Amino acid sequence: MFKKKKIGAIDTLIDKDFVLRGNTSFSGGLRLDGKLYGDLTMEDTGGTLIMGEHSKIKGKVTVETAIVAGEIVGDIKCHDYLELQPSSIIKGDIEYN
């Protein structure tokens, strides 16, 4: 049957009260509960993005793995695994390999 993807460890946590402005890159695992106004890219393969229910990204997202429960205003490109939770809102194109 279907198997759940094993998600790696979270290396970085952005709290719900935190707002980032500008393009950002990360490596490892990122848990976003706050807001990001700018593009988000991974620095190396294996980058995992987990977005909380009240999180928001306004910009282009390029990651290996993503679990989205928040809002993305912009395009998202996932290279390996993409999971959209019922609360997710995507206002842009979705590209998945």
Predicted regions and their residues:
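Terminal amphipathic alpha-helical/low-complexity segments used for targeting or macromolecular assembly
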Residues: 1-7
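Detector for repetitive beta-architecture
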Residues: 11, 17, 23, 27-29, ...
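Extracellular repeat-rich scaffold modules on cell surfaces
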Residues: 43-45
